[in-house]
Curated annotation (Swiss-Prot):
It catalyses: GMP + ATP = GDP + ADP. Belongs to the guanylate kinase family. It comes from Xanthomonas campestris pv. campestris (strain ATCC 33913 / DSM 3586 / NCPPB 528 / LMG 568 / P 25). Essential for recycling GMP and indirectly, cGMP. HAMAP family: Guanylate_kinase. One of its GO terms (cellular component) is cytosol. The gene is gmk. Keywords: ATP-binding, Cytoplasm, Kinase, Nucleotide-binding, Transferase. InterPro entries: GK/Ca_channel_bsu, Guanylate_kin-like_dom, Guanylate_kinase, Guanylate_kinase_CS, P-loop_NTPase. This is Guanylate kinase. Its EC number is 2.7.4.8. Residues 3-181 form the Guanylate kinase-like domain. GO terms for molecular function: ATP binding; guanylate kinase activity. SMART domains: GuKc.
């Protein structure tokens, strides 16, 4: 049985990474695909754990070689998912989660129409502003650009299957887990997973 591909996207500052990490800790059946990026590591980020950090030249070389499942220019830096991180795992029956932006999500849905997509929204613009400023990693000009980009990104929430409002962290994580559980209980998935049982019941 082929694995399920999950897509999680959100504007910067909505708490996407924290929710994803907490969800994966509760649901070990899903593997997180580590993205490639051309940007420099932020304080505390480690290569191959948070991102695969490569130069812009290396990233372009991977594009030309057709190595990416999806890629996009995000906030002036390249981000992408390697084919090798996704296709073999799905074919082997493993579930894979992509933590990407809406541009990458659009590309993925074109290639995998049955992918399950989730968009995370902040509870308010004020909360988004406060969360982004708490990072303390960007100048005021960069912060203004990120806030403007976040508002643009939120316009694309309608392209996703599910929407989570990250007002209370634990609730948001529980809702994400519920989405994964519901996905596994879809009729098509259950028919494949329990084909023998269903056949025996109906004979």
């Amino acid at each position: 049985m082929r694995g399920t591909l999950y897509i999680v996207a959100a504007p910067s500052g909505a708490g996407k990474s924290s929710i994803v990490n907490a969800t994966l800790a509760r649901d070990p059946k899903i593997a997180l695909s580590i993205s490639f990026t051309s940007r420099a590591p932020r304080p505390g980020e480690r290569h191959a754990e948070h991102y695969h950090f490569v130069s812009a030249e290396e990233f372009q070389g991977m594009i030309e070689a057709g190595d990416f499942f999806e890629y996009a220019l995000v906030h002036g830096d390249w981000k992408g998912t390697a084919r090798q991180s996704v296709e073999p795992q799905l074919a082997a029956g493993h579930d894979v989660l992509l933590e990407i932006d809406w541009q990458g999500a659009r590309q993925v849905r074109q290639k995998v129409p049955d992918a399950v997509s989730v968009f995370i929204l902040p509870p308010s613009r004020q909360a988004l502003d406060e969360r982004m400023r708490k990072r303390g990693q960007d100048s005021e000009d960069v912060m203004a650009q990120r806030l403007a980009a976040a508002r643009e990104e939120m316009l694309h929430f309608e392209e996703f299957d599910y929407v989570i409002i990250n007002e209370t962290f634990d609730t948001a994580v529980s809702e994400m887990c519920a989405i994964f559980t519901a996905s596994r209980l879809r009729r098509q998935a259950q028919q494949q997973r329990h084909a023998g049982l269903i056949q025996a019941l109906l004979d």
